[in-house]
Curated annotation (Swiss-Prot):
Quaternary structure annotation from Swiss-Prot or TrEMBL: Homotetramer. Forms heterodimers with either ThiH or ThiS.
UniProt-annotated binding residues for 1-deoxy-D-xylulose 5-phosphate: 158, 184-185, 206-207
Organism expressing this protein natively: Moorella thermoacetica (strain ATCC 39073 / JCM 9320)
Domain of life: Bacteria
Catalytic reaction equation(s): [ThiS sulfur-carrier protein]-C-terminal-Gly-aminoethanethioate + 2-iminoacetate + 1-deoxy-D-xylulose 5-phosphate = [ThiS sulfur-carrier protein]-C-terminal Gly-Gly + 2-[(2R,5Z)-2-carboxy-4-methylthiazol-5(2H)-ylidene]ethyl phosphate + 2 H2O + H(+)
Family: Belongs to the ThiG family.
Protein name: Thiazole synthase
EC top class, as a word: transferase
Compartmental location: Cytoplasm
Entry's transmembrane regions: none
Any one GO molecular-function label of the UniProt entry: thiazole synthase activity
UniProt keywords, alphabetically: Cytoplasm, Schiff base, Thiamine biosynthesis, Transferase
GO biological-process terms attached to the record: thiamine diphosphate biosynthetic process
Gene Ontology cellular-component annotations: cytoplasm
Length: 255
């Protein structure tokens, strides 16, 4: 059986989600997405010309990808809901990544407003993937509100600082019966692989790919890292030990 990630009505074989911001051009973005094999692509609605969407970056996203508009720029649940409704009305589908940010220095998500927006949009039939500051109680409330998956940050968005919240993410993976998709802060393929080895369902990467010297090659590197991390998780990582343990007998062969 294929190792598929089921979210909403989609069965995904790629566990790398890609953001479309910060690329030098739409053409490079499209090439990077294509080389990565990603099936879910997130885009900020405020960058899309809704009067002529086919002349925006949407034109360069490979056919067959699931488009996941995000509510970047929303400061309240009400603003996030409004953006999501506009996206669906414009033909962008019913997937939405909820981003509600009131902190303008670290761009940390407002978990309280995120729960409110999730509950409203889930009731309206959206497939809601909320971006959140990792917190077990909030994650439980997001699940109760109807989230299809939960997207905790690894580090502040765009920072490329890696999995600074790894222990909190590990708790969510253990305790929440929903796909946990690590979003924000991942700066290296090795960090994406670590998230997958921990048991994350997927990772979302943007800045680390878009701002690399060769974004297309970096997208491929992340794809391979995510695949390797998932394979390692399914294979079962060997336990760590405090002391050394020889792989071959140390006594008896000289007798």
């Amino acid at each position: 059986m294929a190792d598929e990630l089921i979210i909403g009505d989609k069965a995904l074989t790629s566990r790398l989600f890609i953001g479309t911001g910060k690329f030098a051009s739409h053409e490079i973005m499209g090439q990077a997405v294509s080389q990565s094999g990603a099936q879910v692509v997130t885009v900020a609605l405020r960058r899309v010309d809704l009067d002529n969407p086919q002349e925006s970056e949407l034109k360069f996203i490979p056919a067959g990808c699931v488009l996941m508009p995000n509510t970047s720029g929303a400061r309240t649940a009400e603003e996030a809901v409004k953006i999501a409704r506009i996206a669906r009305a414009a033909g962008c589908g019913n997937w939405v990544k909820i981003e509600v940010v009131t902190d303008q220095r670290y761009l940390l998500p407002d978990n309280y407003e995120t729960v409110k927006a999730t509950e409203i949009l889930a009731k309206e039939g959206f497939v809601v993937l909320p971006y959140m500051n990792p917190d077990l109680m909030v994650a439980k409330r997001l699940k109760e509100a109807g989230a299809a998956a939960i997207m905790p940050l690894g580090a502040p968005i765009g920072s490329n600082r890696g999995l600074k919240t790894r222990e909190m993410i590990r708790i969510l993976i253990e305790e929440i019966d929903l796909p946990i998709i690590v979003d924000a802060g991942i700066g290296k393929p090795s960090e994406a692989m670590e998230a997958m080895e921990m048991g994350a369902a997927a990772v979302l990467v943007n800045t680390a790919i878009a701002t690399a010297r060769d974004p297309v090659a970096m997208a491929r590197a992340f794809s391979m890292a995510v695949e390797a991390g998932r394979m390692a998780y399914l294979a079962g990582l060997a336990p760590t030990r405090e002391y050394a343990e020889a792989s071959s007998p140390l006594t008896g062969f000289l007798v």
